[in-house]
Amino acid sequence: MDHNQYLLTMFFADDDSFFKYLASQDDESSLSDILQITQYLDFLLLLLIQSKNKLEAVGHCYESLSEEYRQLTKFTDSQDFKKLFNKVPIVTDGRVKLNKGYLFDFVISLMRFKKESSLATTAIDPIRYIDPRRDIAFSNVMDILKSNKVNNN
């Protein structure tokens, strides 16, 4: 199995195997692995944005990726918000699981598609949206949540 296939399969799985794997690696290897994943995510994001543009060209506004879309994430309560931004240290004593079913098939297809796509030959500029760590509104909300946690204890 290719190392990138291994990484992406762990990354897309709905468990903490990816975090356990990264925690067991040295910093340089972890950063290199994260860079590989971001390259594939940038490719997926480019595909999504081009698809959104096609929909908007025929008059359908796809709000999830629209420039005018204001809602970044929907939270039903503050606990969901805290879970998103709470970075708990990862315990490395657990086993890393690898899903070799449909998720693995998806990863292989993604890698082949990226390799054979005409988009892969063009330089992909990094495509990013709001970074919650740098956004003042998110920072203020996090400060409020942290102060509430301190006050409640």
From Swiss-Prot:
GO cellular component: a single term: virion component
Subcellular localization, as worded in the UniProt entry: Virion; Host cytoplasm
Keywords, alphabetical: Host cytoplasm, Late protein, Virion
Entry's induction text: Expressed in the late phase of the viral replicative cycle.
Keyword Chaperone: no
InterPro entries: Poxvirus_J1
Protein name in UniProt: Virion assembly protein OPG100
